[in-house]
A protein has these predicted regions:
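Positively charged n-region of N-terminal signal peptides that target proteins for export
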Residues: 1-4
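Long, terminal "pre-/pro-" and other extracytoplasmic accessory regions
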Residues: 6-8, 12-147
Length: 147
């Protein structure tokens, strides 16, 4: 029992230590910018190069939000859920640390017709305007009555 308590305490201590180190690290690629002011999501979208991201012309559902980085998984899940894709994916960013309180823009668009569904989303850093993540999916429905 004592060994188990020591192991649990040690794990908690090291997790807290690593979190503290990550928060105090001065070499963050994307530190917190929670208190900075940035343009609204609609203004940013209008100024955005449409080669980077453009909503579908006939979109059935679109999202434009300025959120904190820690809210990205929830927004991604909400978008996928509202567009009938019930799987939750993990958001993994490599080679850089992004502070949870970093402001980002989240844009998503969904379009469908009788045979096809298209989804796409993008996460863009509000300060540097660099793309942090994007995703696209396509699904084709076959007509079961055609031969």
């Amino acid at each position: 029992m004592k060994k188990m308590m020591c192991i649990i305490f040690s794990l908690c201590f090291f997790m807290h230590l690593s979190t503290t180190y990550a928060e105090s690290n001065t070499k963050l690629n994307y530190p917190s910018n929670r208190n900075k002011l940035f343009v609204s999501e609609d203004v940013f979208y209008e100024q955005l190069d449409k080669k980077i991201y453009k909503e579908y012309n006939n979109a059935a559902y679109s999202v434009r939000k300025k959120i904190l980085f820690k809210e990205v998984p929830d927004e991604e899940f909400s978008f996928l859920q509202k567009t009938a894709v019930g799987c939750r994916s993990s958001v993994v960013f490599q080679d850089s640390f992004i502070h949870p309180d970093r402001q980002v823009y989240f844009f998503a668009s969904f379009s469908q017709n009788e045979a096809d569904e298209f989804r796409k989303y993008i996460v863009i850093d509000a300060e540097t305007k660099k793309e942090l993540r994007e995703g696209k999916s396509y699904h084709h429905y076959d007509n079961p009555y055609e031969k």
